[in-house]
Regions:
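Short beta-strand->loop structural element characteristic of the AMP-binding/adenylate-forming
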Residues: 109-119, 336
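Phosphate-binding glycine-rich loop
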Residues: 41-88, 102-106, 112-114, 179
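Conserved coil-to-alpha-helix start sites within the AMP-binding
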Residues: 95-100
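Active-site phosphate-binding strand-loop segment of PLP-dependent enzymes
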Residues: 118-200, 205-215, 370
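Helix C-cap/helix->beta junction micro-motif
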Residues: 106, 159-160, 331
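PLP-dependent aminotransferase class I/II
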Residues: 48-53, 61-64, 125, 137-141, ...
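N-terminal "arm"/small-domain region of PLP-dependent enzymes with the aminotransferase-like
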Residues: 1-41, 46, 242-245, 372
Length: 398
């Protein structure tokens, strides 16, 4: 006899909730923050440069610009790319809104390309089909941490004179064909929100190998103000002198955040390894269940997994995604959905976007659930998630 799920009156697999994501902090992290608090600089200090050097070391990129969050990173990347009024920026709808909003911030139009329905990343062929004479850049998201197909995307961008910006909010530590993702595209942005693999509380960064882009990114981060005499309109009045040479923003990261993030980055490989262990265990358990579908991983990507996406198979279930999601919640397994297609939002609808633009992305949205995945999960936690999925899938199987 099939075990009854908690939502149908059965007993939950556990009595306490498992978060879908959670920061993982230890004494070294606490000490790193305390050390900054006891120092002379809480912001605009030496920890920022130390962090930027650390990010360059990890990614292999020549330059890093630390900023206040991942959205700020995307914004200044678009500004540095020269994106403006009348331009178009191609991106995926299966992402957080910031990946498209960054184009709007610059007066440009986001254009949504469809996804590969196996990997869930942006489909290079769909990107190619959406290139017009107005296209200025492609913002490709490393969804769940898996690298986008960068070779194909770079080929398209070079063919049409476009810049490739990788939204690597999920993918710090990921490698594509053996090369860290932060050093491949023209610019790569990172996010360090608490549910990401490493965190600064809030924080972001832009990586590039291009010195001219780096100079622009640095300006846009700090009001468009510089103390570099080479960028000034005239000889400085003295050592105190600075000039605003462009319209920038206050997107600076604090030294407190940088200190925490440096400590977190020291554990990046540890975090990556544990997340991979959990993903492998999930894959092994779910691959043989016809009621659910496992995300395909490309062999070129050595992935730091930020999210674990479970896709339900409507042909094999008598419940839909919402009911499956709520059934997991009743088992005390807290899940999420990543993502609602960006152009579904009322703001985008007011701009003239309509459903039907990206059929594969829209179908994916109807069927996905993000399961718990973070370093601090115990083996028991992982087993409980697996048991809950198996119980629900079996009970509601067609």
């Amino acid at each position: 006899m099939l075990e009854k799920p908690a939502v149908a009156g059965g007993t939950p697999v556990r009595n306490t909730k498992i978060f879908y994501g959670h920061q993982c902090l230890d004494e070294a992290d606490y000490q790193a923050v305390l050390d900054v608090l006891k120092s002379d600089y809480l912001t605009c200090g030496p920890k920022i440069e130390e962090l930027e050097r650390k990010l360059c070391e990890i990614t292999g990129a020549r330059y890093a610009v630390a900023v206040s969050n991942g959205t700020a990173a995307l914004h200044i990347a678009c500004l540095a790319a020269g994106i403006g009024e009348g331009d178009e920026v191609i991106t995926t709808p299966i992402t957080f809104a910031a990946s498209a909003n960054c184009a709007l911030y610059c007066g440009a139009k986001p254009v949504f390309a469809d996804i590969n329905d196996k990997t869930y990343n942006i489909d290079p062929e769909s990107v190619r089909q959406h290139v017009t004479e107005r296209t200025k850049a492609v913002v490709a998201v490393d969804y769940t941490g898996q690298s986008a197909q960068l070779d194909e995307l770079l080929e398209i961008c070079r063919e049409h004179g476009l810049l490739l910006i990788t939204d690597g909010a999920h993918s710090i530590g990921t490698k594509y064909k053996g090369q860290p993702t932060g050093s491949i595209a023209d610019m790569t942005t990172f996010s360090f929100h608490p549910v990401k693999t490493v965190t600064a509380g809030e924080g972001g960064a832009v990586m590039t190998n291009d010195e001219a882009l780096y100079q622009k990114l640095s300006l846009f981060r700090t009001h468009g103000i510089t103390r570099n005499p080479a960028l000034m309109s005239r000889e400085p009045d003295g050592s105190w002198y600075y000039e605003q040479v462009d319209l920038g923003y206050n997107y600076r990261m604090t030294d407190i955040q940088a200190g925490l993030l440096i400590s977190q980055l020291n554990k990046l490989e540890l975090f990556k390894s544990r997340r991979r262990e959990i993903v492998n265990k999930y894959n092994a358990a779910f691959s043989g269940i016809p009621q659910v579908i496992v995300q395909e991983e490309i062999p070129e990507s050595d992935t730091t997994r930020h999210l674990y996406i479970l896709r339900i198979n409507p042909e094999k279930l008598c419940i839909d995604r919402k009911e499956f999601f709520e059934a997991l919640g009743a088992e005390n397994i807290c899940c999420n959905v990543h993502y609602i297609p960006v152009y579904y939002f009322p703001y985008y609808q007011k701009l003239g976007y309509e459903k039907g633009l990206c059929p594969k992305a829209e179908k994916l949205y109807e069927e996905i659930i993000s399961l718990p995945l973070y370093y601090g999960m115990s083996d028991r936690d992982v087993d409980d998630v697996i048991t809950a999925v198996q119980k629900i899938a079996a009970y509601y199987a067609k």
